[in-house]
Amino acid sequence: MSFPKGFLWGAATASYQIEGAWNEDGKGESIWDRFTHQKGNILYGHNGDVACDHYHRHEEDVSLMKELGIKAYRFSTAWARIFPDGFGNINQKGLEFYDKLINELVENGIEPVVTLYHWDLPQKLQDIGGWANPEIVNYYFEYAMLIINRYKDKVKKWITFNEPYCIAFLGHWHGIHAPGIKNFKVAMDVVHNIMLSHFKVVKAVKENNIDVEIGITLNLTPVYLQTERLGYKVSEIEREMVNLSSQLDNELFLDPVLKGSYPQKLLDYLVQKDLLDSQKVNNMQQEVKENFIFPDFLGINYYTRSVRLYDENSGWIFPIRWEHPAGEYTEMGWEVFPQGLFDLLIWIKESYPQIPIYITENGAAYNDKVEDGRVHDQKRVEYLKQHFEAARKAIKNGVDLRGYFVWSLIDNFEWAMGYTKRFGIIYVDYETQKRIKKDSFYFYQQYIKENS
């Protein structure tokens, strides 16, 4: 069985990771500009000031996409490029950049898929509380609707947010991403304000009969209980704790998006641990219920699985620790586990109302080297091949999977890791900005031809 007719083969990037031009043509400062310019936040002090210089090289990059043969390109718009202060004053030059990019894509037969928020909040909004401030819902709405209304005739697929988990928890609990806050309660406020922002925009699109599809992208990680220890019987409490820890990664986001409520068991546990108060939980549930609206599709970013076991001395909010099974790992230290993608897709199909799904990111970082002007990234080719197979198997088993976007089109700024991790199927020499097509580029090009 090959992939269904019209299956959307694509590649993905994000504004801060590739654009550069951080303060050009009227762009405002974003939280990632601020965060990377502060010493000690990013490996080797790297920043995205120039990144892949896509802002000046978009024509070259679109011609590479055309050569690759992708049907769609997923990218994000930089809020601070359009509203330098987060709201109010509109920067026309910022809009003109996206006008050009979208026109180039359409002219080359590539469907633009736009992510409205991929982590680069205007710093001016962070100064008044950012995602933890309930007012953000209105600021985001103003920005999102401006972009949707401007491009609705050319852009038919919209993603409200990329990875709310990372925005909330990496940015506001673990503090390893911008804005670098370390407070679980604040992170939960962020989760909630993102959900309300998502609903408000989806509702406006539907109520105004705007002829587009709109969804959200969640990074989901299937969690497996480590049971392979000899003669070991798993107790009920162990199973429950591993399950609750999984809900913090997955259901905390999936449930409100697809069912209109947060997982109550998880919230009760957090109240019991004094990480939330019960009145707040009631308000959260009530507001999600009142504002809920079902999206047109779900985007899933999948990279690896998580294997966990019970450990009451873990010191984490759950008595759980992570196991690292023997096997193949990428440069990010992530296990290569394509079966996890299949398991995840089947679980969503069986646990949630039916919804079209796109894999909006999947890929791997390896230590790529240029040899004779080529990059022989055989491990990435294998990684992609195995995950395409898992996707195909899921479709065969009734999953309504409509498309797949490789992460990433091009090597780029990998957040806290700076430029040390390469995910692209196109290599970038950051000194010269020269692009080199990796072996995985040619593999993907051929695969698309054979499966379209």
Swiss-Prot record:
Superkingdom as given in the UniProt entry: Bacteria
GO molecular function, one term: xylan 1,4-beta-xylosidase activity
One GO CC annotation: cytosol
Keyword Hydrolase carried by entry: yes
Catalytic activity of the protein: Hydrolysis of terminal, non-reducing beta-D-glucosyl residues with release of beta-D-glucose; Hydrolysis of terminal non-reducing beta-D-galactose residues in beta-D-galactosides; Hydrolysis of (1->4)-beta-D-xylans, to remove successive D-xylose residues from the non-reducing termini; Hydrolysis of (1->4)-linkages in (1->4)-beta-D-glucans, to remove successive glucose units
Main enzyme class: hydrolase
Record has Hydrolase as a keyword: yes
One Pfam family per UniProt: Glyco_hydro_1
TM annotation in the entry: none
UniProt temperature dependence: Optimum temperature is 75-85 degrees Celsius using p-nitrophenyl beta-D-galactopyranoside (pNPGal) as substrate. Retains 100% of its maximal activity after incubation at 75 or 65 degrees Celsius at pH 5.5 for 12 hours. Retains more than 80% of its maximal activity at 70 and 90 degrees Celsius and less than 50% below 60 degrees Celsius. Half-life is about 11 hours at 80 degrees Celsius and about 1.5 hours at 85 degrees Celsius.
Uses, biotech or industry: Potential to be used for bioconversion of carbohydrates and biomass in industrial scale. Its high lactose decomposition activity makes it applicable for the removal of lactose from milk and dairy products in food industry. Has high activity in synthesizing galactooligosaccharides (GalOS), non-digestible prebiotic food ingredients, from lactose by transglycosylation. In this process its excellent thermostability mitigates microbial contamination. Has high ability in saccharification of lignocellulosic biomass such as steam-exploded corn stover.
pH-related activity note: Optimum pH is 5.5 using p-nitrophenyl beta-D-galactopyranoside (pNPGal) as substrate. Retains 80% of its maximal activity at pH 5.0 and 6.0, and 20% at pH 4.5 and 7.0.
Family statement: Belongs to the glycosyl hydrolase 1 family.
Entry function: Has high beta-D-glucosidase, exoglucanase, beta-D-xylosidase, beta-D-galactosidase, and transgalactosylation activities in vitro. Has a very broad substrate specificity with the highest activity with p-nitrophenyl beta-D-galactopyranoside (pNPGal) as substrate. Active with pNP-beta-D-glucopyranoside (pNPGlu), pNP-beta-D-cellobioside (pNPC), lactose, pNP-beta-D-xylopyranoside (pNPX) and cellobiose in the order of decreasing activity, respectively. Very low activity with soluble polysaccharides synanthrin and locust bean gum.
Complex and partners: Monomer. Homotrimer.
Protein name: Multifunctional glycoside hydrolase
Species in which this protein is naturally found: Caldicellulosiruptor owensensis (strain ATCC 700167 / DSM 13100 / OL)
